[in-house]
């Protein structure tokens, strides 16, 4: 009896030691990940410090610290249209991300519950939509917006962002809704709740993490989008941040390269989404992983 009782203990401790062990392949992988993280952080820090220097000192020693700090570089960037472009990007990106989630949530819920036999084929259509490159849609979208007079307008760009966001948003939320237990909906139905009331008052609050994840991912994607904005926006007043940055870099080639101003512009484009993603990274990761395997 003593021997038989001791055996499981030995096995359990051996299992713990095996789980705690890190193989050479995994150690190399972890090391490479940390190396990539360190390189990314150093590049971001270098970009921030360089944005506070003048062009001459940057050429003399690219890796030196700012001395003195030139906050005027950010004034130069704002005078080149970054302030107006930041407002345009925030309005279009935020509203498009919000509307895409609002439209995708009911569709994803219906597909996740397979309310009719068309749910499977419709889900496949949304999945296929993920593989359509934006370059293929560019010319048809341009002609359609030209017909309705919405080229070079922020509402037109808003509609484009909502449209191209739907396949991924529906796909992401479908997997998330499938991870939610169906027993809650059955209990609500027994209590007399309609399908609409069940969706709005029970399912949506439970899916809050998934909805926030979808919103943040679409917001970041819209904020950084350049292709459709470059093709559709023609007047400076409607430019978004990536377009103003590209124009600012082009202007410096003729005025004399203001490298400090260019790096300040890069910081203005990168910083908002970087801070937002860093703040909500845990919620985003948990929201994306909850629906895996369902």
Question: What are the residue ranges of the model-derived segments?
Answer:
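A hydrophobic, multi-pass inner-membrane permease signature
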Residues: 2-294
